[in-house]
Each structure stands twice: as structure tokens, then as C-alpha cells.
Amino acid sequence: AASDVYKRQVEWYHSIGTEKSPGTKAFALTGNVVNTGLIEVPMGTTIREVVFDIGGGIPNGKKFKAVQIGGPSGGATTASDEHLDLPLDFDSLKSIGAMIGSGGLVVMDEDTCMVETARFFMRFTQNESCGKCVPCREGTKRMLEILDRIIANEGSLEDLDLLQELSKTISETALCGLGQSACKPVQSTLRHFRQDYLRHVVDHHCPICNGRKRRLVIKPELCKGCGKCKRNCPMEAISGEIRMPHTIDNDKCIHCGACWGACPFGAIDAIEEED
């Protein structure tokens, strides 16, 4: 859009989008959607248009379940018409506890456990915490421990109350924006997908994830040792020499998927750990 703005001036750019959120926005569309990649749309474009018109809908005949908007500090929306027809602008997303943030749009289908999704983003945030303030450093660690317990089907209804309490405390007392928004994925999934939590803490069985633990591995027979996964890993969890099979240290891995997206040979796989 930069060249167009330069040629046509700011008035033209402000004519696009909404009154309070003019212009366009670039989003990274990924997840369980037919067409993934970077897209640029007018502010105010609805989630339905992005997922089903631009994204091509959900592959393999699966049902749409949610979109995580705004990266690890964002919130999840549901498959309700109210959320699907929500404009992607600052005020509309704020009204449901989400945010544009980094512009990430992760589409999820019916085979996604939202508790696992919340844990995924909490693990990332906990690893990224600088550790300066206690609410973020210790609070996110405690929340991650609770989510681990819930995923293992060992949680309780009291854990859900504790997650709510910790989320409120951390968001109100953390020193920087990372800590203040770190709990949004947990807060939004508790609000909109509470049934997923209840399957773990009441039924003690989730038909989607069954409390399974997964780890990422590199298949040596497919790995060419190109090093792309290693260069893209934000946690330096991948090791290996050029032209030799690489390996992933799952003690460092945060399951962000950067290696999976970077590998041109399909050598990255997720396997279930034995109990």
C-alpha cells in the first residue's frame, strides 16, 4: 500500500476501511484453512470474509471452530454469526477481548482443543517473559503449570477459578505490554470455550486431545540438513551440521511451528509421548 499512498495521497488511503480504523491491514493467515499466507485487506473486513472468501474455508470437510487473532497476546473468537460477522478493526476486536496485535490469524477446526491452544500460547509467553516483574515471571509460570495439569486430566473446577484470578492479577499488575496481555488467550478460551475445559476437569477425558502429550521430531530419513529449521527456531532448540540430519531439543522447544513452516522437505512431525 505504501506506493499507492505516495501516489494518491493520504485522503485516498483514509477513504478505505472504517471511520475509526482507516486504511488497510496486513494479516498472516494460517492454521486449518485452505489458503494460507500474507493478506492485505481493508480495515473492517469481516472474519467470515477472511476465512471463507479469501482463505477458502476449512479443508477436508471439517467444521470451523475458532480464530486466534493477534498472536500470543490476542484472543479467540467463536463460530457464532456474531463473531464471524465481526469487523476486523480495533474497537470491534477490543469489545470481545481480542486485539489486532501482530496481525496473526490462526484458524482452527473442530479437531482443536482450545485448552491445548491456550497452553501453547501461554508456553510461548512464559518463555518470552524477561523476568523483571513478579506477576509476569511467576504468574505465567503458575498458569502454565495449571494448564499442564488440566491437559493431563488432573485438574479441577477450582483450577478454572484460579486461572481467572491469576489472569486478572497479572494483566493489572505486570509492568509491560507483554505481561498485561499475556493472559488474553486463556481469558478468551475460558469465556468462549468453557466446555473444552470442562471435558478435562469434569469428564477427565477430552475426545479431541485425550490429554496426550506431543513432541516435535525431525525424521532423519527426510531431513537433508539444509539448516532452514535451525535458522528459523526462536529458541535455538535445533542442532545439526549442514547436510546431516538435525534434531530438536524438546526441553527448549515451545511448539511454535516455525520449523515446520520452514522445512521444505516435510521432515518435521509431531508424535505422541508415552505415559
Language-model-detected regions and their locations in the chain:
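Short, small-residue-biased leader/transition segments that mark boundaries at the very start
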Residues: 1-6
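Iron-sulfur cluster-binding cysteine motifs and their immediate structural context
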Residues: 135-141, 228-247, 258-274
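Short, contiguous acidic and Ser/Thr-rich linear segments
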Residues: 34-46
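Terminal amphipathic helices with adjacent charged low-complexity linkers/tails
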Residues: 59-93, 191
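Short pre-active-site segment immediately N-terminal to redox-active cysteine/selenocysteine motifs
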Residues: 129-132, 222, 251-252, 262
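Ferredoxin-type iron-sulfur electron-transfer modules in oxidoreductases and energy-metabolism complexes
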Residues: 85-215, 220, 235, 240-245
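Short amphipathic, charge-patterned alpha-helical segments
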Residues: 44-59
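Residues forming anionic-ligand binding surfaces in small-molecule and nucleic-acid pockets
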Residues: 19-33, 127
